[in-house]
Each structure stands twice: as C-alpha cells, then as structure tokens.
Amino acid sequence: MKPGGLLLAAIAMSAAYAAAAGAQTPSTNLPVVWVLSTGGTISGRGASPTALAEYKSGSMLGAELVAGVPEITQFADVKVEQIVNVGSPDITLDNWLTIARRINRIFAEDPKVAGVVITHGTSTLEETAYFLNLTVRDERPVVLVGAQRPATAISADGPLNLLNAIRTAAAPEARGKGVMIVMNDEINAAREVTKTNTYRLETFRAPELGFLGYVDADRVSFYRSSTKRHTSRSEFDVSSITALPKVDIVYSYVESNPAMIQALVASGDRGIVFAATGAGTLSSFEKQALQPVLAMPQATRPVLVRSSRTGNGRVIAREDYDAMGLIPADTLSPQKARILLMLALTRTRDPNEIKRIFTEY
C-alpha cells in the first residue's frame, strides 16, 4: 500500500472506532470524561498473545482503546482525543506543555466535564503526572493510566485499568484530590507515586505514604488526601510559557565523576538536582567540584537541590548545605524535584522563594 493509502486507512480506522465509541453511549446524563491518548504499552500490539516484552507501543489509537471496553459507557459519556502518540521514554517537555494546556482548555470551555483521563506509557508516567499536578488549574480530577502488558497479551491489564481510571475521573469524590494514577485497582497521588517494578502489575506504589484509595466492583473509595499544594491551589501557570528552564540530575555514587557537574554548568543549566546518597549527602569530590559554581554570581549560577537516591524518606535542611546554597527536596524523588525546580525557575531565582516552593509542594 502506498504511504498515502496508509494514512487514509489510519484516518478511516480512527473515525470508525470514534463512531463506535459514540454509538455505544446510552445516555447524555452520564458524567462527561475526556480521554487523551498519548501512546505507551496500554496501546501496544505484539506478534502473539505471549509477546509480553517485544511489542510496538502506540499501535492502537485512543478511540480504539475506548471502543474495546464497551462497559465504559455504563459509567461515563466519553470523548476521545489522540493528543500525541509516543512511547513514554520519548515524551518531551513540549508534550507536557501541550497536554497541560489542553486539559486546562477542556475544563475552561465546559463546566460539565467531570474529569480527564490520560492513557500513557508507564516508564515516565509518574513524571507526567507530577508535572500536571502542578500545572492543571482546576479541582476536577485528572487520572493517568497505563498498562504493564500490551493490549494483545494474554490477561492484558490495560482494559480494566482504563475502565477504573474513567470510573475514578467520573466520581464526585475524586474532586480536589489532584492528579492521580489508577492501575491495578489502586489510586495513587501523583506527588508520592513511583514505578517500583519493571514487569509486575502492582508496580506503582507510594511506599511510605500509601494509596489514596481503591477502585472496587461496588465503588471508588478514598481513604486519604495529599496535603501538599496542587492543581487548583498551584501558583504555576504554563499558558504562555514556550520552553521550560534547563535542569538536570547528577547521580551520586562512589568516586562519582565531578566533570559531570562542570559539563552541566558549561551547557547552561539553570538548575541541578543531586540524586545524593543517604539523607541527601554529597561526597567531598562533589563538594569540591561545586566550589567554582558557588563562586559564580547568584544571578547566573544554577540553583542547586539535594534529593536522595534511596527512594524513601525526607531530605531536610542542614547548616553545612544551607551555607552552600543547596535546597532540600523534602520527600520528592530526584526526577520530581527536577520538575518542581523547572517550574519554580519560571517564577523566581530567589533561593528563599524556591525553598518555600519545595516546602509547600
């Protein structure tokens, strides 16, 4: 088939699935939920039902995913949009800005929308979720969902995950809970959740703070809320931002190479997050490498944040690091500390203001 024919076939297939999804909607009295599809394993196809590791992600469009779970129409009037189509390792900061703006526009244009679901690959799902937790300006729920097995696999987890995500987005109890991840019948908060296993279905965990709730056969149940600022209480506005400040992560290990710090500064990084050992401890090699950075004028030197590579626990303020200007990341993982620092730098370079932001978010 010629390339033009392939494109026409893809368009026709998308239209057919969209029509099928619309035809299944039994009532306009159901909550309206938007599904924004971005690709990932949940939309992947393998060569056989046992192909659990070798498959092509993003092979199914969002309309096809929704049409494949007709039970969805019992719970919501679903509108589907394919906003991007990439594997989550290839998601970009521009994609994040596009998704955040689209969600904010959906909420602003239609007060009847109950919530938004985003289908997403699991590799970077927690990062996208936390970015949206800081940039969606509405109390209505945003739920990210993925799968550990492709759609063609035996016992694929994607269909039930998608159904449960839509049920959560449609639930009145989900308002004000911030951005969430729903997988394996469990509801997690974007700030605390992380992927903990490469293949197991129960991969998403908030190891110390626990689930927000569960999605069971009878109802969506919540047992706690995140008290940190998010969504409708967030100060971050990306409506007119064209690019996010450059921030990178330096991973600490025995005799780590200090040249990495120098290279990031030379490349123009506006911030550096340390995935430090233990309770956010830098080695003497790293401290030495930071001396030229600390000698730079405050207006031009990168903002420095201490997080921990351990995966659990707080990184707290210490006099020696405070004197060096390193800001503690509290319980944020290195990758989430990077996201918060990028957004903080869109507003200020004042160290005290950035400390406040890391305390409140």
Predicted regions span which residues?
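Accessory alpha-helical/coil subdomains and C-terminal extensions
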Residues: 30, 36-37, 61-72, 189-271, ...
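Internal gly/pro-rich beta-alpha loop/helix module
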Residues: 144-217
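Bacterial N-terminal signal peptides that target proteins for export
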Residues: 1-8
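C-terminal non-catalytic interaction/assembly regions of soluble proteins
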Residues: 279-361
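Short Gly/Thr/Asp-enriched flexible loops that form oxyanion-binding sites at enzyme active sites
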Residues: 118-140, 284-292
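Short, acidic/small-residue loops that bind anionic groups at enzyme active sites
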Residues: 129-160, 166-170, 296-308
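ATP/NTP phosphate-donor binding region
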Residues: 24-106, 288, 312
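Boundary at the C-terminal end of the N-terminal hydrophobic targeting segment
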Residues: 18-23
